[in-house]
Amino acid sequence: MQAAELPDKDGTVTIATQEWPFQPGPREVKVYIYYPGKSLQQVNKETGLILNLHNWGGTNTSGAGNPSVLTKELNVIAISVDYLQSGSWKDQSGAPYDFGYLQAIDALRALAFVFQGLQAKQIPFNDKRIYATGGSGGGNVTLMCNKFAPHTFTGVVDICGMPRLSDDIAYNLPGGSSLNARYSKDPHSPDYLTPGGQEIRYLGNPHHLKLMKARGHETKILIIHGSGDTTCPYADARDMFQNMKAAGLDVSAKFVTENDLDGKIFKSIGHSLGDRTQMIVKLGGEFIIPGRPQYRLRSSPTDIELKQDVVYPTSDGRYVISWQKGIPEVRFEAQ
């Protein structure tokens, strides 16, 4: 796929990814790979893979899980990605915030790189144990990855992620969230947010959720969100959860209230929540760790192997996530 090879020890690689219209030309992202025992040699036939995705404005694992804990407790290779627009948001200009679109492509390409790299080296691993998690912006990218790769993940854990690109966040409206994605309402502006662009980024989109279910989506989704979160508004997370349930997806939610605050895992009902690593291990571990009552394996081949298009219609056309080459590329087709 790429010239880079899997490192023998914990390390980083740079992989090619999809072009960004705001900066035409080849684009690469940095991928951080963390092995059980910090060594590729420690990977065994039960080892899984987990995307561990940083927050809006962060890099590597900021706002996400501690990879040394995840690799040990869950027996996984942890994969973090400096996806599009990683790093300080206030220091960036010239484009609105991608909000999980090409960011998900970057993360999924990193996952495919490790998946295919293990296969190329003929290293046994458990390809039925594939997960994603992230905090805040990383929770958003986690759920967008699940949307763009509906056959790939065994389970995903969204910790206080953005459920949708609301008008409030897109246009920095007064009141509401403090987030500002810097989109424009002017159809002639390069920063214009199209109707479809908003619809594809809506993770509680009832029509798209029904399509995921119809395609045989079997991923366990866990949403962990503070009931007092005003940054990624709690009401949006609650609505997304209800829409996922209504579509028949396998989803559960932990909406953190004052009664849950233990000073250890849950320290706040706001956006920061508490110890996100332990949330992944303790709550996500219920279905990720072998031997637990809710433990499960995925039955379907991954999108990496299926090499089929995943299509989401919108009011102005359709989005096609093409897996034909075993790595994803997304495009919009106007109607």
Question: What spans do the regions from the language model cover?
Answer:
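Alpha/beta-hydrolase active-site loop
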Residues: A95-Q122
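N-terminal cap/lid segment of alpha/beta-hydrolase-fold proteins
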Residues: M1-G48
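Active-site loop/turn elements of alpha/beta-hydrolase fold enzymes
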Residues: V81-Q85, G161, E258
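Short, surface-exposed "cap/lid" segments of acyl-processing enzymes
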Residues: E28-E73, S80-D91
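Phosphate/oxyanion-binding active-site loops and adjacent basic polyanion-contact surfaces
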Residues: F22-V29, F99-L108, C232-P233
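The feature captures the conserved acid-bearing segment of alpha/beta-hydrolase catalytic domains
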Residues: D167-K245, S252
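C-terminal catalytic histidine-bearing segment of alpha/beta-hydrolase fold enzymes
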Residues: R238-Q335
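Primarily recognizes the serine-hydrolase "nucleophile elbow" in alpha/beta-hydrolase
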Residues: F113-G175
